[in-house]
Design a protein with these regions (language model features):
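Terminal targeting signals and extreme-terminal segments of soluble enzymes
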Residues: 1-142
Length: 142
């Protein structure tokens, strides 16, 4: 197993504390994963919503960065890390105070880059956002 697979198994199993930023932002962990894909459900806390009960777009971007990183971890090389070099979120519908199904997937992996995308769906299956990122592969210590 690679460091990414080990870490994803720990997060899925609840066997490790989540990083402070994840705890502070209430991003949560991970429900399931396999090579090239990840999945989680997430319920927004009331204090994370706009005054009209909608999801704050910047918060959706933080969730996107997390799920896209999880997806990249499924194919990350054993001898390297990665860093987000580009993140784009397309907002399709207004998100509300309801459970979201979030799925990330690897679109392509080259020697130096991992391309990932994610969908955010409300309980009725309607797409509310789609996110895209490029993860630059960097050697450990680099």
């Amino acid at each position: 197993m690679t460091w990414g697979a080990d870490r994803l198994d720990q997060i899925k199993g609840g066997d490790t504390p989540l990083p402070p930023v994840v705890q502070t932002l209430k991003l949560g962990g991970l429900d399931d994963w396999g090579e090239g894909w990840v999945r989680k459900t997430w319920t927004p806390a009331p204090e994370l919503l706009n005054s009209d009960g909608s999801l704050f777009g910047g918060y959706v971007a933080a969730l996107a960065d997390q799920i896209l990183a999880f997806a990249a971890m499924t194919v990350a090389p054993a001898d390297a890390l990665f860093r987000t070099s580009n993140l784009k979120v397309d907002f399709i519908r207004v998100g509300k105070a309801e459970i979201l199904a979030i799925e990330g997937r690897v679109v392509a992996r080259t020697k130096g880059m991992i391309h990932v995308e994610a969908d955010f769906r409300r309980p009725d299956g309607e797409l509310i956002a789609r996110a895209f990122a490029q993860q630059v592969i960097v050697p450990f210590g680099g």
